[in-house]
């Protein structure tokens, strides 16, 4: 998980680790299910070392009220450098990179060496993408209207659809090449 | 006591539809063998002109095959006369189309009750059934509206309610999400899922990978024939995080 994500979640108000975790769960829904409970704390520790976050402890801990995990007793606060990093991160342009070249070259190499049928490779890939699409679509269908996670799932679904359309183009192209060679 | 319900809602053997002859002969549907179990949702995908819509028209009795057999719930329908075929289309099959095909001069509830009235049910019974169906698809509050006052997703819900009017053996859908945006598509997919859970048999031809991915079985069609079949059932892999680029 990117440090900036946790940093930005902390920008709302000083928070305990478990509160940050709850906000992540809320925003990610089923996408965040595989998230390890300790991950947020690992990131927070790194952020603290980097001087982007400081911690405050309650002056007189009340054993009845405090959480079991000692890390949960701390309140995390953004430092001025942390604030600045969040502001920078929000204006940065970044976008996940799709890696199409490797798959494309796999088809080209398989056909050139006569190692495998490119159409067979396309088929296998298509089934895998359809399985992933099924999973994302089912998760999207289970979300209530207007949930944050539903919007994220829609993004996953649309990207998978785009990949599937490209596979269709691959199939058409390799079918034509096979029949004309 | 009649015999047990047949296991298959639909079966075709060697189903073929050709147009033209000689040099210009086109095999729109070419010797298709298809079996659809009761309660199954089957999606048929393929490029434009692959014959998937023609296939749907043949099994729904909207068009006649050149050769081959069609069994609907254990009954041969490929040799039915015109009148019997018209009755079959009204009572045994429900259609859902891309462009909804609702009658714009009739209200929503009048559209939905029409098939029941045509099948000879009393107006009172047809209306009650239509209202129950509109309730089921979540647009009962629009019963008195004209279809043009509804969103695309709502219109498709009404079309689905109409398709269910006579409790058909089979619901056939032709590009049901073709005219819908992303949110309305999700809505229709949820509705199909509900139908599936209630045991309705569905055959959907579509370009939309989202429908294909939610079906029990996906058939790929090319040049009038089935070229691939994939069963997509299975549990979750828990990889949604990775799919979102959210590495855990």
Set out the residue ranges of the language-model regions:
Chain B
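ABC family nucleotide-binding domain
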Residues: 7-215, 221-226
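ABC-family P-loop ATPase nucleotide-binding domain
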Residues: 1-18, 231-248
């Amino acid at each position: 998980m990117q440090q900036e994500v946790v940093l930005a979640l902390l920008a709302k108000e000083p928070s305990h680790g478990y509160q940050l975790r709850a906000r992540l769960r809320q925003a990610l829904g089923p996408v965040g299910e595989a998230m390890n409970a300790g991950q947020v704390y690992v990131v927070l520790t790194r952020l603290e070392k980097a001087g982007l976050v400081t911690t405050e402890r309650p002056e007189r801990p009340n054993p009845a009220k405090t959480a079991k995990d000692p890390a949960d007793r701390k309140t995390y606060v953004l430092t001025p450098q942390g604030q600045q990093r969040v502001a920078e991160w929000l204006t940065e342009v970044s976008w996940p990179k799709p890696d199409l070249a490797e798959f494309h070259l796999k088809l080209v190499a398989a056909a050139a060496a006569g190692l495998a049928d490119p159409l067979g490779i396309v088929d296998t890939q298509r089934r895998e993408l359809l399985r992933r699409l099924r999973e994302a679509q089912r998760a999207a269908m289970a979300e209530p209207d207007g949930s944050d996670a539903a919007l994220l799932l829609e993004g996953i679904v649309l990207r998978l659809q785009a990949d599937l359309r490209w596979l269709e183009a691959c199939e058409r192209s390799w079918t034509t090449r096979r029949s004309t060679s | 006591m009649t015999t047990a319900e047949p296991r298959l809602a639909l079966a075709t053997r060697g189903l073929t539809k050709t147009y033209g002859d000689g040099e210009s002969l086109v095999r729109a549907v070419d010797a298709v063998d298809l079996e659809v179990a009761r309660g199954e949702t089957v999606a048929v995908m393929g490029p434009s002109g692959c014959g998937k819509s023609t296939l749907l028209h043949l099994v729904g009795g909207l068009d006649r095959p050149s050769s081959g057999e069609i069994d609907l719930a254990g009954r041969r329908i490929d040799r039915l006369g015109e009148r019997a075929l018209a009755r079959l289309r009204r009572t045994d099959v429900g259609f859902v189309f891309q462009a909804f095909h609702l009658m714009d001069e009739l209200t929503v509830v009048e559209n939905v009750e029409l098939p029941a009235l045509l099948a000879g049910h009393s107006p009172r019974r047809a209306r009650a059934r239509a209202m129950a169906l509109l309730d089921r698809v979540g647009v009962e509050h629009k019963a008195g509206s004209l279809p043009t006052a509804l969103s695309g997703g709502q219109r498709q819900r009404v079309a689905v309610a109409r398709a269910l009017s006579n409790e058909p053996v089979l619901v056939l859908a032709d590009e049901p999400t073709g005219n819908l945006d992303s949110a309305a598509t999700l809505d229709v997919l949820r509705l199909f899922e509900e139908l599936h859970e209630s045991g309705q048999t569905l055959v959907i031809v579509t370009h939309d990978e989202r429908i294909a991915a939610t079906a029990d079985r996906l058939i790929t069609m090319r040049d009038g024939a089935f070229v691939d079949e994939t069963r997509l059932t299975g549990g979750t892999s828990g990889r949604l995080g990775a799919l979102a680029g959210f590495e855990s």
